[in-house]
């Protein structure tokens, strides 16, 4: 990958790349990121704020709403929508510092959004991947995934929505007592997640997205520049088409997302 001499050149690169990959018809952009390779290509002093702005501003300036995971995995105690940090990466923490950000209420799997339709993530249901979750709300909403420096084969959380919708027997619904606060006011508890079973000694039910990601490429829905193995990829793929492919894949092989075979019961 070429070196970026300034943040403006980085901004220009992403603006041009998003357009070439076909972002124009989409209203929502759900982003997965790993900036290690891109950060190493900046010749200017690395400043987190400028770096993240250069990557996201081209989307905001094009009237897109950007959605980014801000998972905190707060399984007990208190989750504050405004104060609890994310345990993910640079972009994930950056978005929480933006003045216009909206963040969802789920204490384990929250999402943050900026842009004209950022309200989509607010006041969601208590299921992390099921009814009235972010993943359900994005269906039919002209949404695309954009992977920046993160290979698709590493996995996407949409697969858990598919598992829950299709009734994967290797996961179960777990309710958490974490108390959720918004602007210092208690808004509720009893949020749920569809988590891995731990009662089968011969299987850990860890996921493997390699086969499923190949299906996405084979279906021709992934537009991409850069090289995933070098973490320099920018990959854009349609949300609804991705979900349709994953649902069909699961119904054909209920262990498609697992690291080893398992017979549903």
Write out the residue ranges for each language-model feature:
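N-terminal and secondary-structure boundary signal
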Residues: 1-265
């Amino acid at each position: 990958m070429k070196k970026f001499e300034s943040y403006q050149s980085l901004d220009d690169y992403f603006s041009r790349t998003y357009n070439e990959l076909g972002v124009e018809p989409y209203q929502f952009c759900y982003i997965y990121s790993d900036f290690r390779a891109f950060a190493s290509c900046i010749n200017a002093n690395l400043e987190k704020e400028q770096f993240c702005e250069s990557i996201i501003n081209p989307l905001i300036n094009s009237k897109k709403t950007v959605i980014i995971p801000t998972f905190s995995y707060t399984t007990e105690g208190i989750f504050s929508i405004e104060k609890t940090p994310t345990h993910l990466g640079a972009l994930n923490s950056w978005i929480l510092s933006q003045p216009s950000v909206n963040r969802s209420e789920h204490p384990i799997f929250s999402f943050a959004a900026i842009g004209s339709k950022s309200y989509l993530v607010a006041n969601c249901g208590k299921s992390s991947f099921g009814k009235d979750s972010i993943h359900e709300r994005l269906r039919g909403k002209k949404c695309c995934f954009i992977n920046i420096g993160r290979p698709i084969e590493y996995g996407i959380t949409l697969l858990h929505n598919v598992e829950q919708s299709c009734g994967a027997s290797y996961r179960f619904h777990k309710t958490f007592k974490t108390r959720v606060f918004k602007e210092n006011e208690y808004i509720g508890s009893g949020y749920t997640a569809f988590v891995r079973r731990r009662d089968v000694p011969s299987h850990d039910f860890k996921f493997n997205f390699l086969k499923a990601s190949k299906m996405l490429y084979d279906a021709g829905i992934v537009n991409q520049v850069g090289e995933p193995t070098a973490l320099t990829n920018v990959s854009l793929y349609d949300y609804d088409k991705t979900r349709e492919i994953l649902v069909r894949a699961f119904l054909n092989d209920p262990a498609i997302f697992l690291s080893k075979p398992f017979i549903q019961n």
